């Protein structure tokens, strides 16, 4: 009986979802989410929908982001997040270089930086802006990658990559 109980509980710990992020703070936040949404909550992979306000989330990798509502983000792993809609400001320390932020239109690989991404699903546009540092923006349909550095922006609209602009 004790062995069965041990096997059942150890199986629970072996197969339970890993905690990949923590909500650091919220400001005037109103949520629609199955995941916990109070500051200090540890998060497993899943989707967060922020109707209004701001939320600061830190991933176990050390990467962190501020989500501005209305927004929807899917936490995939400590090194990968998907912005479905809305705006996010991302900060990636050295230990999290290689962090990936996906959007419906492309994705950014971080090389140690602060950057912002906005997704408008109605207009089918994803915009990327580097505040400080460097990212690579990838367009999966064409297979192209564009490197952005300080104050550069690029957008992908309806599958077309716009030229870089100085911000």
What are these regions (language model features)?
Residues 2-47, 51-154:
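Flexible, surface-exposed loop/linker segments and immediately adjacent secondary-structure boundaries
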Residues 157-167:
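Pro/Ala/Gly-rich low-complexity, hydrophilic intrinsically disordered segments
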